[in-house]
Amino acid sequence: MDISRIRALRGPNLWTRQTAIEAIVRCEPDERAIDSQPEFEATLRERFPQLDPWPRLPEGMSLAHALKRVALAFQAHAGCPVSFARCTETVEPGTYQVVVEYTEEAVGRAAFDAAVRLIAAVRAHESQPFDLATVLAPLLSPIHL
């Protein structure tokens, strides 16, 4: 998974009236069908059991879809009232636009970065435990400034 651009959409935009983080994410062929890799979802849920269930998509679930869901869930668990996220494949196969709502830009960016790190750790089969409190701490600090 390669992220070529991340930007903050600081007002009404093509996707939503809310503020959002938009990223361009390129996935390799094996990263475009993670729903056919049950060990990925199982390992991700071991590390982040608070993650909501995923719907089965007709086109399959990519790492970009997982990134969207994890970034949104991190913000929700940090107490941010967010609900909007989209992942849309572009005209270039394997390239996705990922959009995740935020209420505080610093929190949205930190949640997105934490989601990237978690997915990379799961893909690399890292064995160190995932501590949700440690991940949420930097997400909470900008709110209390």
Predicted regions located by residue number:
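Acidic/histidine-enriched alpha-helical segments
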Residues: 122-145
